[in-house]
UniProtKB/Swiss-Prot annotation:
One of its GO terms (cellular component) is cytosolic small ribosomal subunit. Residues 1-20 are annotated as: Disordered. This is Small ribosomal subunit protein uS15. It comes from the Archaea. Part of the 30S ribosomal subunit. PROSITE patterns: RIBOSOMAL_S15. The gene is rps15. The keyword Ribonucleoprotein applies. GO terms for molecular function: small ribosomal subunit rRNA binding; structural constituent of ribosome. PANTHER family: RIBOSOMAL PROTEIN S15P/S13E, SMALL RIBOSOMAL SUBUNIT PROTEIN US15.
Length: 151
């Protein structure tokens, strides 16, 4: 598939192994995995980082195979998922960093374009999350509120 804001195709990546059961060497139960996920989520780690830590430190290749649920679903079930979805939060952090950069480097037109693309992606995501009732209907993106939410 093509990239969103360019005419190029995406670079190739590795595919996940087609596995339907937990490997024999992964010796951790579903309950223990959920406890570790909830503990890390309470420490403030995002679901992607939790997945990396589980893979590298605990030897869990795929949380969904072990528990039957994704990391985000486990976090939602235990009420430790953040109010603002992580993808939207990360995009807002990126937009804030770009704004800080543009305050110091006012003539950087390439970063200005990147900020425009990032903020339009934020607006599309906000529209989606409002329609799916993840965010309140009156929630709007503005750089000032994003700065307050992120910091």
């Amino acid at each position: 598939m093509a990239r969103l804001h360019s005419g190029k195709r995406g670079s190739s990546g590795s595919t996940r192994p087609l596995r339907t059961e937990v490997p024999a060497w992964a010796n951790i139960t579903a309950e223990e995995t959920e406890e570790v996920i909830v503990k890390m989520a309470k420490e403030g780690k995002q679901s992607a980082m939790i997945g990396l830590i589980l893979r590298d430190s605990y030897g869990i290749p795929d949380v969904k195979l072990v528990t039957g649920k994704s990391v985000a679903q486990i976090m939602k079930d235990n009420n430790v998922y953040p109010e603002i979805p992580e993808d939207l939060f990360n995009l807002m952090k990126k937009a804030i960093n770009l704004r800080n950069h543009l305050e110091e480097n006012t003539k950087d037109i390439h970063s200005k374009r990147g900020l425009q693309l990032t903020e339009s992606k934020i607006r599309r995501l906000v529209k989606y999350y409002r329609n799916t009732k993840v965010l309140p209907a009156k929630w709007r993106y503005s750089p000032e509120t994003a700065r307050l939410l992120v910091e």
